[in-house]
Amino acid sequence: PRLVKPVPFLYPVIKHYERPYVGAGIALYDVLATIGSRKGRAMPFHRHLSKKALHRAFPALSDHAAPGAIKYWDASVDDARLTLTVVRTAAAYGALAASRTQLVELTKSGLGRVNGAVIKDLETGTEYTVKATNVINATGVWTEETESLAGTDGGLKVLASKGIHIVVPRERIRGDVGLILQTEKSVLFVIPWSRYWVIGTTDT
């Protein structure tokens, strides 16, 4: 929980008829967030804002940019720190963690079941064989490459995506919340991040 920070966003409604269906979609988002929370809601429900309230929240927007907006809450997390926290927690419960290692081979039992791995210490070049009851492939965009080391195809296709973002100092854009804006083919995010704004699409 200490790594997750709530982030408010505005979705400017360009046309008045957008309010009902966009609001309904975000309301569903609220419902799912409530159902998925074990200890009650962690963030407020969405709100409909007038043109004046929109301008107060994000003065950098033109007065004529939109007749209003919908404010909703999302969250941000430092994924590197989250991963490190998971590793440290596992180590505290008795797991052995090894950084700077490379998977060389997945070993199999006589029945053809994966039962361990050969890993290489990238600092010394030494290879070790590790036996395991279960082996979990959590290698992200390298999932298929890892599967190939076992000589099998798990049927899971993972496609890499790329995002290009512009990073702008916070003082260059007057606003207190994030923005999600419709473009011709996609959406554009303006996300507050530390002392900066991160501006860009999800994928390119």
What are the language-model segments listed below?
Residues 10-15, 71-80, 96, 102-105, ...:
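Conserved short loop/turn motifs at secondary-structure junctions
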Residues 1-57:
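Dinucleotide-binding Rossmann-like beta1-alpha1 core, especially the glycine-rich loop
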Residues 51-59, 87, 188-197:
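Structured alpha-helical segments in the cores of large, soluble enzyme domains
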Residues 119-129, 133:
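A structured beta-alpha segment of the ubiquitous adenosine-cofactor-binding alpha/beta core
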Residues 3-8, 105, 129-133, 137-204:
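Active-site substrate-recognition segment that forms the wall
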Residues 99-115:
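A conserved short coil-to-beta-strand element within the FAD-binding core of flavoproteins
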